[in-house]
């Protein structure tokens, strides 16, 4: 764990902790796109720190406390009860304040969401199908439910590499377009994040 942390730990006075590299890729891309349009992206003085999973969030917060660093967490809805319990304990001990924990589901005003739910379903399916050579259609997906759990179900309940579609997006950015709905979700997210620092 110490080695993983040392590899990932590039910090600045203002740090946004996210679960993985895919969060970093999506957030950086949409921040740049929105700024080019004259809209709000992530503040330049905020560093995105991918920690390698929800289970490592609490460890990173512990490492950063006491260093006069401002830390905000941006998380998928918890599915790991132990990671959620560790974070709640840190809030109780005032190691991090509850208002500095942002969940994608709160920005999207849903009960459950991952970063992939910031996209319209058809846009994320374009990334997924392009990555894995599949032909999943919008009709195969329930628009009211989180997309990742549905894709896992359609993949015989096997997990898949969440970074791969983000990497596909980065490599094919010139041929991809995203809707105003998706851009608005990301802009709303950046406004929420920027207001926390």
Can you say where each PLM-predicted feature lies in the sequence?
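Generic recognition of stable, solvent-exposed alpha-helical segments in well-folded globular domains
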Residues: 22-25, 59, 110, 114, ...
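Activity-critical C-terminal alpha-helical subdomain
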Residues: 77-164, 168
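Generic structural signal for hydrophobic core residues of well-folded globular domains
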Residues: 30, 122-123, 127, 131, ...
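Short amphipathic alpha-helical segments and helix-helix/interface helices
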Residues: 61-62, 87-91, 190
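Terminal low-complexity/disordered tails
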Residues: 150-152, 159-197
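Generic structural motif recognizing short loop/turn segments at the entrances and edges of beta-strands
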Residues: 44-47, 97-101, 174
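RecA-like P-loop NTPase motor core
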Residues: 1-80
């Amino acid at each position: 764990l110490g080695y993983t942390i040392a590899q990932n730990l590039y910090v600045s006075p203002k740090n946004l902790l996210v679960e993985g590299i895919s969060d970093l890729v999506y957030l950086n891309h949409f921040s740049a796109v929105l700024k080019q349009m004259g809209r709000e992206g992530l503040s330049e003085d905020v560093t995105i720190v991918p920690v390698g999973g929800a289970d490592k969030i609490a460890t990173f917060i512990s490492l950063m406390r006491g260093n006069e660093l401002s830390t905000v967490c941006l998380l998928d809805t918890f599915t790991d009860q132990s990671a959620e319990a560790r974070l709640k304990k840190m809030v109780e001990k005032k190691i991090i304040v509850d208002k500095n924990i942002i969940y994608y589901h709160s920005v999207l005003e849903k009960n459950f969401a991952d970063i992939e739910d910031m996209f319209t379903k058809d846009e994320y399916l374009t990334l997924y199908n392009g990555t894995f050579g599949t032909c999943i259609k919008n009709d195969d997906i329930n628009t009211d439910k989180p997309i990742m759990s549905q894709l896992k179900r359609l993949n015989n309940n096997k997990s898949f590499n969440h970074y791969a579609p983000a990497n596909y997006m980065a490599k094919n950015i010139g041929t991809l377009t995203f809707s105003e709905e998706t851009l608005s979700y990301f802009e709303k997210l950046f406004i929420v994040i920027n207001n926390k620092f």
